[in-house]
Amino acid sequence: MGETATDSEHRMMIGLSDPMKIDPKRDRFPCCIVWTPLPFISWLVPFIGHVGICREDGVILDFAGPNFVCVDNFAFGAVSRYIQINKEMESSRSSSSGMFNGERRYEQEEDSHEKEPTWDDALRKSTQEYQHHSYNILTCNCHSFVANNLNRLSIKSGGWNVVNLATLVLFKGRWVNKTAIVKSLLPPLIVYTIGILLGGWTFIASCSILVVLLTGWFIIGTYCFKKLIQL
């Protein structure tokens, strides 16, 4: 079967010439960032969702509650969108000139004589760290966990946070299938249709305020008060 234009564009975006096998039926997404909508919250703010990161064998890891990282049991349902990462081409760990500030903190914790950690090694360290973190949707959430992993891996020279991670998934995430599109977009469409019919401009204004407040919180908490949003 020939490669579609979408397939080719996605490969170019992530730098893959031969992507690892993805199997949505078995929930296997090797070296991927994965996303699924959150009940109720995503119905009002569709670009907000739950994210996880996958091991090399495709098993999903996601920070789903206080001191709890799910393994191979993605919270809130099946994966709807994903981004596969070429770990060899995307990592800049070996480039000292491209080292991001956050990575220095992680490297100081490790023995300089140890061999360079693998993808799964980095995910294991982040998992162990977040098993001692309290969960808070506003300050320490699933996006914090995935950003922590990406920084350990020095993906795209690091500097990952909840804002640029959410932006990446929103604009670069690839839909798993048509069912995933319907599952993600139909509930917001229904809610907004009913809300506009019943509430009119009041409903639109309320949703707009909610979007501005949530977006503003994470942007200000990430870039103005850097200790507020944990990574």
From Swiss-Prot:
TM stretches of this protein: 33-53, 180-200, 201-221
Q: What is its main location?
A: membrane
Report keywords, A-Z: Membrane, Transmembrane, Transmembrane helix
- Protein name (database record): Protein RTE1-HOMOLOG
* The UniProt record lists the keyword Membrane: yes
Source species of the chain = Arabidopsis thaliana
Membrane topology according to the record:
Multi-pass membrane protein
Would the keyword Nucleotidyltransferase turn up in this protein's UniProt record? no
